[in-house]
């Protein structure tokens, strides 16, 4: 549910049918595969170490910004957000800023119901903050750690009534899950469902939708909604409370979050306050989004309630008289975790760093299909910022949340202009890191694995200025790629922005690219059969010859009839030719069926109810593969028949190669995988 990935990431999520995602490197020398989670410690020792680390963080360089006051915030945000929502065609937005334990500013902009012109109220209007919901799940985990009912470094399976796989011979821990290093494959089936009656308890959802483990736990970050839900289920089991009841008792009531709930449908008392969600503010409202993995993204909350949540975390677990976490537990939760390059943002326990202008900032973004939100905690200044938009908006108008955050930081917490010259090896290193990459948060073994090759990321070296750019990932407002210059060995910084990327090599010598958002990485594609260019050639040839063969079939018949020519083939050759044509038709039916299924998957409209149709489609694909063998026989027989034209023989050969390549593509990318967990 996290989609903090700008244009390229949005394309990935769209093509993968994901509604995911809202969504620092010189000193580290260990490769990603060798980086382990911290060794088990007692909670008190871990908290002391985390506190020491937090206290020893160098202070930001003193640069005077605008004084952070309600008056100045009003002038600043009133000039920015209305402009954003107008240009991007967003119906409404809400923002809250807290400082030193108090709500400093909160305001709604635009409409919660555009047709009725109902204004957004920061106190009452409910927005859907998506994956910011996860911060509640993580905080619940830490409460149970305090009570000794959960251990961050124990095998999570001891808290479950089903088994998370140990594919690599190593157990998955809650620390792995909270840092998004569970190693589990991406999964989206039934992430959202179409109506309330399709919702199932997480106790049933989790064992029936168990993904494969594609990385060793504690190694490669790969964001996971599923793993988050596993953590919530562990809380539910050890606490003995339904997760919704747990949230009400331990968070919403003591924090006076009167306009907040994870429940679906909303309680009757809250339904009148729910904002509509829109694709475009000028369009019609969409239905309420039913989130199957509720602990990962079903929160509905007002900005004021989210302000209380931020205050609690900024005050290390305290809100008013309520102590949600012990101070040492909160500090431990907010502390940077091991395993990320020193000069890049890292995961905390649930939160992740979004450091800017010399200030340490922990954050969490969130996205449903319609609502897009972000939460930032500027720890060294005791300031929190929450913003949410109730529309997807026009895709060509950039990232409103990211723009607001950077402008906010530059205004109130600016940094001096950095003088970071290029390294002497900038040209050589830019060329060495260029090439195709794949995202770690991906489908690897299920029917959506094909999205990995469709959305291959490319890092390109620009010889004109010795920079690199990431195809589609970091773009300026004008749509042009943002260029990065090497400022330290294998650390590249945007030439006109704060973004950084860094490269290390894993245990197999493949490059891993760390990004500003630390919950996933890019991994070098070094296998030719997995590269996009090769697969496009295979698919292009296969689809091309199949479609042309089908088209030529009636055309050739019409021409023969017109010129009164007979088909110069013996009965056996005619039979094989007929079977080859049927194989082509089957392949075309499969291709059209796959495009249909993929369209529904993009809209998250093909959940468990579509299993039979997908199985039928896979059977058609297998029949197409059998038909491919028939095209080989047809081609072989044509070459042994001296009466057939040479061009006919060549075409039969191309058809056989194309059909076999098409079938290889289906098998290689698991499109014929009869497991329907995806």
Features from the language model and the residues they span:
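Short, glycine/proline-biased beta-turn/loop segments that scaffold the active-site neighborhood
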Residues: 152-167, 255
């Amino acid at each position: 549910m996290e989609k903090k990935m700008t244009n390229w990431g949005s394309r990935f999520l769209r093509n993968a049918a994901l509604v995911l995602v809202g969504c620092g490197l010189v000193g580290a020398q260990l490769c990603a595969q060798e980086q382990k989670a911290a060794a088990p410690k007692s909670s008190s020792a871990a908290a002391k170490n985390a506190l020491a680390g937090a206290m020893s963080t160098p202070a930001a360089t003193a640069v005077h910004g605008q004084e952070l006051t309600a008056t100045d915030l009003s002038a600043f945000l009133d000039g920015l957000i209305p402009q954003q929502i107008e240009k991007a065609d967003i119906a409404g937005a809400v923002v809250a800023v807290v400082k030193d334990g108090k709500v400093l500013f909160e305001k709604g902009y635009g409409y919660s119901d555009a047709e009725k012109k109902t204004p957004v109220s920061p106190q009452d209007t409910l927005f859907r903050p998506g994956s910011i919901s996860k911060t509640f799940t993580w905080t619940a985990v830490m409460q149970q750690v305090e009570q000794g009912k959960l251990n961050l470094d124990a095998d999570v399976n001891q808290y479950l009534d089903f088994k998370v796989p140990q594919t690599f011979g190593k157990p998955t821990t809650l620390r792995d899950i909270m840092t998004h290093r569970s190693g589990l494959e991406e999964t989206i089936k039934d992430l959202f469902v179409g109506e309330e009656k399709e919702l199932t308890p997480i106790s049933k959802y989790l064992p029936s939708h168990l993904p494969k483990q594609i990385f060793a736990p504690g190694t490669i970050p790969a964001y996971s909604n599923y793993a988050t839900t596993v953590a919530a289920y562990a809380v539910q089991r050890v606490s003995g409370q339904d997760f919704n009841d747990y949230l009400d008792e331990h968070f919403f009531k003591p924090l006076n979050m009167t306009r907040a709930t994870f429940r679906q449908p909303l309680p009757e008392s809250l339904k009148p306050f729910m904002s509509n969600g829109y694709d475009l503010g000028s369009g019609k409202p969409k239905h309420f989004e039913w989130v199957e993995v509720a602990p990962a993204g079903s929160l509905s909350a007002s900005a004021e309630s989210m302000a209380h949540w931020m205050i609690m975390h900024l005050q290390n677990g305290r809100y008013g008289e309520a102590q949600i976490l012990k101070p040492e537990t909160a500090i431990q939760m907010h502390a940077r975790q091991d395993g990320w390059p020193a000069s890049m943002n890292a995961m905390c326990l649930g939160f992740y760093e979004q450091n800017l202008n010399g200030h340490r900032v922990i954050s969490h973004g969130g996205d449903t299909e319609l609502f897009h939100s972000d939460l930032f905690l500027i720890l060294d200044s005791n300031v929190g910022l929450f913003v949410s938009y109730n529309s997807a908006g026009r895709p060509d108008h950039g990232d409103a949340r990211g723009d607001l955050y950077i402008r906010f930081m530059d205004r109130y917490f600016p940094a001096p202009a950095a003088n970071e010259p290029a390294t002497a090896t900038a040209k050589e290193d830019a060329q060495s890191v260029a090439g195709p990459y794949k995202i770690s948060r991906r489908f690897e073994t299920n029917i959506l694995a094909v999205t990995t090759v469709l959305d291959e990321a490319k890092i390109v070296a620009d010889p004109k200025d010795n920079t690199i750019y990431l195809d589609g990932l970091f773009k300026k407002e004008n749509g042009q790629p943002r260029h990065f210059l090497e400022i330290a060995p294998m650390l590249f910084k945007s030439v006109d922005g704060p973004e950084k990327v860094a490269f290390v090599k894993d245990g197999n010598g493949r490059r891993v690219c760390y990004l500003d958002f630390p919950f996933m990485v890019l991994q070098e594609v070094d296998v030719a059969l997995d590269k996009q260019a090769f697969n496009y050639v295979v698919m292009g040839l296969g689809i091309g010859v199949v479609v042309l063969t089908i088209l030529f079939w009636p055309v050739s018949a019409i021409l023969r009839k017109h010129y009164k020519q007979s088909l110069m083939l013996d009965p056996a050759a005619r039979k094989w030719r007929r079977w080859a044509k049927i194989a082509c038709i089957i392949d075309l039916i499969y291709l059209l069926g796959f495009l249909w299924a993929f369209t529904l998957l993009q809209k998250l409209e093909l959940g468990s109810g579509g299993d039979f149709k997908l199985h039928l489609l896979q059977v058609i694909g297998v029949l197409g593969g059998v038909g491919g063998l028939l095209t080989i026989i047809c081609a072989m027989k044509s070459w042994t028949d001296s009466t057939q034209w040479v061009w006919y023989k060549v075409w039969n050969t191309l058809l056989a190669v194309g059909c076999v390549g098409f079938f290889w593509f289906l098998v290689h990318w698991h499109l014929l995988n009869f497991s329907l967990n995806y």
